Design a protein with these regions (language model features):
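Class I SAM-dependent methyltransferase Rossmann-like catalytic core
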Residues: 1-99
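Class I SAM-dependent methyltransferase SAM/SAH-binding core
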Residues: 99-144
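Short, aromatic/basic amphipathic alpha-helical patches
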Residues: 112-120, 194-204
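A short acidic, Gly/Pro-enriched loop at the edge of an enzyme's catalytic core
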Residues: 137-154, 167
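Short catalytic micro-motifs in class I SAM-dependent methyltransferases
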Residues: 155-159
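A short glycine-rich, Lys/Arg-flanked "PGG" loop and its adjoining helix->strand segment in the class I
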Residues: 164-182
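Core SAM-dependent methyltransferase catalytic element
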Residues: 199-230
């Protein structure tokens, strides 16, 4: 009896080995799906990729194409129009001319830079922690890479987001020439908050504060005039 069992197990083992060898041989001879040549017939019945070769390659857009797509959106155009209106008011005050050298600090994606350029301002520099070429270059607003008195006007709509507001303002003042202007826009605030912000400026005198609407938000524009050459 035991002899018959051993014979049966031996036959079963041989059969298993034969089947496994046949499967391995078939797998070895079969062309892998990842190596299917590009001229192979299409497979319309396949709705989902089964391999990296079946998947559709993702199109890589150039920076120019990405920018054109971004700049054509309604959101971008609305914000751009808002900044244009804002800067036209500064031009009416005599603060902006075509040859005014303007620095936009924490310029984000660059709405203000584009607005100023469209107005005809020839020398506009936008900086942000993350660059957005070609409008905005990378720089730390708390440590601006510019010489003293390099600009006629410095603007920022993001003072409230600065990690160190006093340092942020100090760098704006440093880069503006004597009798130049610093303009900041903050969330709409009262006289006490305005005085607190004005107190951050140690080389400029307060000119005025005006409530404005910018990018659909109620804001307060604070205008400072640089007076010290220090």
């Amino acid at each position: 009896m035991e002899r018959h069992v051993r014979l049966f197990l031996n036959k079963l083992s041989f059969a298993s080995i034969a089947i496994a060898s046949l499967i391995l041989l078939l797998l070895f001879l079969q062309t892998p799906q990842t190596c299917i040549p590009p001229n192979s017939p299409p497979k319309p019945h396949l709705k989902f990729p089964k391999s990296s070769c079946d998947s559709t390659p993702r199109q890589i857009l150039s920076v120019d194409k990405k920018n054109k797509r971004l700049w054509s959106t309604k959101h971008w155009q609305n914000n751009l129009s808002s900044f244009l209106n804002f800067f036209h008011a500064l031009r009416d005050l005599g603060l902006l001319h075509n040859h005014t050298k303007v620095l936009c600090v924490s310029a984000g994606a660059g709405h203000e830079v584009m607005a100023l350029s469209q107005m005809g301002v020839l020398d506009v520099t936008g900086v942000e922690l993350v660059d957005s070429p070609p409008l905005v270059t990378r720089a730390d607003p708390h440590n601006l890479p510019f010489f003293d008195h390099a600009f006629d006007l410095a603007f920022s709509a993001h003072l409230a987001e600065a990690l160190f507001p006093s340092r942020f303002v100090s760098e704006m003042e440093r880069t503006v020439r004597p009798f130049g202007s610093c303009v900041v826009v903050v969330e709409e605030c009262g006289d006490d908050e305005v005085r607190e912000i004005v107190g951050l400026f140690t080389k400029s005198r307060f000119v005025n504060s005006v409530n404005v609407t910018l990018t659909g938000l109620k804001m307060t524009r604070i205008l400072m005039k640089r007076v010290s050459s220090r």
